[in-house]
Amino acid sequence: MREWTIDTWVLYKVDEGDFDALDFLLAVLRHHRVVFDCERHIEQEYQRCLKRTRNRYLEEWFKRLIARQARVFYSGRLPSRHERALLRMKFDRSDLPFVAVAFRSKDKLLVSEDSDYTQHVCGYLQQQLQVKVLSLSQALKLAEDTQDP
């Protein structure tokens, strides 16, 4: 059972009709856990997405995630030197909690293809924080493999 940090970008892809995004969320719901921050910034972002999209599949996914107790919580604060470094790279401040929980999580997996995750940012996250930023196709393949590494 892996711990996944899922950027809201993935939820918006589901709303756009991306079947890989939907398959990924369903695989995570069946076999894995989703990482949230104790401060609830990520949950608030998810709720904003659900409110904007009014997508019943996303709403049901989120309800089932809670019912299945498939959430795990970590601090959403990054050490300040990493926060400063990312902000210098023009990384969006609202995405910092996602990076922070990915950093603290067991598997250090973050799924996003958002433009904030430039090659430079992804390199920094991998080298300095051991956080691996995965594309949707990479994440789907890994999520469907239910064996832990």
Regions flagged by a language model, labelled:
Residues 6, 18-53:
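PIN/NYN-family metal-dependent endoribonuclease catalytic core
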Residues 22-26, 62-63, 99:
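Short amphipathic alpha-helical segments and helix-helix/interface helices
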Residues 11, 41-43, 116-118:
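Short, solvent-exposed loop/turn segments at secondary-structure junctions
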Residues 12-16:
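Short N-terminal binding/cap micro-motifs at the start of the first secondary-structure element
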Residues 1-4:
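Extreme N-terminal starter segment of soluble prokaryotic enzymes
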Residues 71-110, 115-121:
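Active-site neighborhoods of divalent-metal-dependent phosphate/nucleic-acid chemistry enzymes
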Residues 37-38, 108-111, 115-149:
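Acidic, PIN/NYN-like endoribonuclease modules and their adjacent C-terminal/linker elements
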Residues 43-44, 48-70, 133-149:
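Extended, non-globular alpha-helical segments
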